């Protein structure tokens, strides 16, 4: 199986843990005899937090390394960059983290929560008496697909609950930004 997570660059701090989890799980399965008596072999590549490189590395895993499935990506932009490769080569991607929804591909197993399963319930709680009865909201995120789409969904939800635009602020930072002074 392929393991397609950034081990260097901006996303390494998050994705390295996913790589380690995949390897730990594979080791556990292999310690119990593997799958149908055969051990699973992990092929790990580093797309280095470089979105176009994700597609190149996915193609390498499928065509050169002959993996039957790939566990990988964190950001929506990395997932979207590999989708054409998985579709073209009819291979499987297991996408392990939350995502913005609004996408359904037969070659992807989405294992994380969508906004209606995570952000909406959290916002409902914040608006409840138990959650503090919030009436004003600040939507923020990194400037890419997941935060923008999730915040669009949250804004529509807040409007449906009577919250007006004057009580909603929205801000995005560039990817890799670290100076919040």
Could you describe each region identified by the protein language model?
Residues 1, 20-42, 132, 159-166:
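Signal peptide-proximal N-terminal region
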Residues 1-17, 73-74, 136-142:
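Short beta-strand segments enriched in small/hydrophobic residues
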Residues 1-13, 86-87, 94-95, 100-101, ...:
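Glycine/serine-rich loop-strand microenvironments at binding/catalytic pocket rims
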Residues 3, 16, 80, 120, ...:
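Residues forming the Rossmann-fold NAD(P)(H) cofactor-binding site
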Residues 13-20, 32-102, 111, 172-180:
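Beta-alpha junction/loop-to-helix N-cap segments that form part of ligand/metal-binding clefts
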Residues 16-24, 117, 121:
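A general alpha-helical scaffold signature found inside nucleotide-binding enzyme cores
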Residues 56, 100, 107-181:
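Extracellular/periplasmic Venus flytrap/periplasmic-binding protein
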């Amino acid at each position: 199986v392929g393991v397609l997570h950034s081990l260097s660059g901006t996303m390494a701090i998050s994705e390295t843990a996913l790589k380690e989890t995949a390897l730990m799980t594979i080791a556990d399965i292999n310690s119990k005899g593997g799958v149908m008596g055969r051990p699973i072999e992990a092929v790990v590549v580093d797309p280095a937090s470089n979105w176009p490189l994700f597609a190149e590395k996915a193609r390498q895993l499928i065509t050169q390394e002959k993996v039957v499935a790939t566990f990988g990506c964190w950001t929506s932009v990395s997932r979207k960059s590999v989708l054409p490769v998985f579709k073209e080569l009819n291979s499987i991607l297991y996408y392990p983290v939350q995502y913005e929804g609004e996408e359904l591909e037969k070659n992807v197993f989405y294992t994380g929560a969508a906004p209606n399963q995570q952000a909406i319930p959290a916002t409902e709680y914040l608006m409840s008496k138990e959650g503090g009865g919030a009436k004003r909201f600040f939507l923020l995120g990194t400037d890419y697909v997941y935060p923008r789409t999730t915040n669009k969904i949250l804004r529509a939800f807040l409007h449906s609950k009577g919250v007006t635009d004057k009580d909603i602020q929205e801000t995005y930072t560039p990817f890799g930004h670290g100076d919040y002074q």
